[in-house]
Amino acid sequence: MTQKILLIGNSDGIGAAVTRTLIARGEQVVGLSRSPSPLGPDGPRHILQDITAPEYPQVLATLLANEGPFDVCIFCAAIGSKLTLPDLSQEARVIDVNFTSMVRTLAALAPGWLERRQGHFIGLSSLADDFYNADSPAYTASKAGFSHYLVSMGLKLRLHGVYVTNIRFGFVDTKLPKASWKPLMMTADQAAAHVLRCLETKPRQLSVPKFAGLAIHGIRWMQSIRIWWS
């Protein structure tokens, strides 16, 4: 059965890979991002929009009014950051793009889904949500908020027929990773395959690769001990 899917932040990286795969499967796709569609003018409908702009919620409301309800929304938008003191000027924007805009997107979609008692929101988070990073505090904070919010909303909304999936990726070969060392890095197409599987299985949370997730959790545990005793 064909699904109607809204992709936020699908102009490159994992979002672009997911878009290409969904189109090949025959799904009905609408994309929204600040940059043009990865498939060009012959691709599916694509809306150019900065998701941090004040008018973004109204753009979503108009889209829902004109297009009708979506079965699924996949939120792929994210930006990285590397903090170089004393410049903190981009910290708030990172949190706005990565976290606040996701919350605003779900807020626009949830009422219709609750009324229909069906819908699925998939958010792309990061294993970086589980440790402290002095070089990228806004990024790790945004992903920590992202993951905690989506898992919590999933617990709330699933009781009403609406599914929420939080996918925590390790390093993916896109423009996003800022680290010099990127172990167990996967391609955007490999990451997209995990997203597509989540469309079918609807887990509350998926962490990939799992070994990296366990390693990062261990790092967080050691960080917490050091901070506790500092």
Locate predicted features:
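Active-site loop-to-helix junction immediately N-terminal to the catalytic Tyr of the SDR YXXXK motif
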Residues: 132-140, 152
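Conserved NAD(P)H cofactor-binding loop of Rossmann-fold oxidoreductase domains
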Residues: 74-82
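Active-site helix of classical SDR
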Residues: 106, 142
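C-terminal helical subdomain
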Residues: 166, 181-217
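Short alpha-helical oligomerization interface
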Residues: 83-96
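Residue(s) in the substrate-gating loop at a strand-loop-helix junction
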Residues: 126
